[in-house]
Amino acid sequence: MKHLLSISDLSKDEIVGLLDEADRFKEVLEGREVKKLPTLRGRTIFTLFYENSTRTRSSFETAGKWMSADVINISASSSSVKKGESLKDTGLTLSAIGADAIIMRHPASGAAQQLAQFVAPGGNGPSVINAGDGSHQHPTQALLDALTIRQRTGRIEGLKVVIVGDCLHSRVVRSNVDLLSTLGAEVVLVAPPTLLPIGVENWPVRFSYDMDAEIADADVVMMLRVQQERMQGGFFPSHREYATLYGMSKEREARLKDSAIIMHPGPMLRGMEINFQVADAPRTAVLQQVSNGVHMRMAILFALVAGSDATI
């Protein structure tokens, strides 16, 4: 595996292998006062973010540093991108400096694929990891979500996973649908008609407008943020109506199965898609998702950058 651009880049065995590797990193680091491994010593990793990020960027940086890599952060707002430099020239510059991997977030769907073609023609050059491209894909988020589900429930195959919210603009939902369906979960999308993707009837999912009917027997309920920054018009009448119909209220949380878990890729809009208290409830796995993000991204960097003879 040279790049990680989309969940479709991975076979089922490769997905399971990354989940297992992330669990191994967690086990190795647990209880260590100094969280440092020599695995990527001498490697140089650039994070190149054209959009804001807290969880993804900081967890990739932490993952690289815990593996002894040199991690250099590039923000579009403070780089030559601000002067009009193209994605191609930015990528080639980082490659010429000596990048072993470039982790990129970009507002344009397909940008990660383009960058990989620019910097690694014929497979020679740095690895590219997609940290989110427009509303297209966010493969590392789907992998850490799957890791969290497996840790909480012991399995993924046969589970009913209900994803609620802005499915139209979400790159997270696309990656999760690809991954969870590959691993044998039943995936149901719940959203108002205006926030379901075009062509969703061809996806390996069911879709519904009725949240209460679908979450009653769900094993996992994943709430999505309403991405107002990607909306040009009115997709629903009001925030209050949206919260009433599609928010995870205390009443809805109380009606879930005892074993059901609640997830959210973040950032959360408390009081809109999820109740303030529900966000902190024991069955809510949000902070576990965040901590798993570091271990999963360590596993990804290990697979792409460390080399075939490397050991943890």
Curated annotation (Swiss-Prot):
Carbamoyl phosphate binds at residues 55-56, 105, 138, 141, 266-267. Signal peptide: none annotated. The keyword Nucleotide-binding does not apply. GO terms for biological process: 'de novo' pyrimidine nucleobase biosynthetic process; 'de novo' UMP biosynthetic process; amino acid metabolic process. Pathway: Pyrimidine metabolism; UMP biosynthesis via de novo pathway; (S)-dihydroorotate from bicarbonate: step 2/3. It is an enzyme of class 2 (transferase). Keywords: Pyrimidine biosynthesis, Transferase. It catalyses: carbamoyl phosphate + L-aspartate = N-carbamoyl-L-aspartate + phosphate + H(+). GO terms for molecular function: amino acid binding; aspartate carbamoyltransferase activity. PROSITE patterns: CARBAMOYLTRANSFERASE. GO terms for cellular component: cytosol. Its EC number is 2.1.3.2. The keyword ATP-binding does not apply. L-aspartate binds at residues 83, 171, 225. Coiled coil: none annotated. Heterododecamer (2C3:3R2) of six catalytic PyrB chains organized as two trimers (C3), and six regulatory PyrI chains organized as three dimers (R2). Belongs to the aspartate/ornithine carbamoyltransferase superfamily. ATCase family. This is Aspartate carbamoyltransferase catalytic subunit. It comes from Corynebacterium glutamicum (strain ATCC 13032 / DSM 20300 / JCM 1318 / BCRC 11384 / CCUG 27702 / LMG 3730 / NBRC 12168 / NCIMB 10025 / NRRL B-2784 / 534). The gene is pyrB.
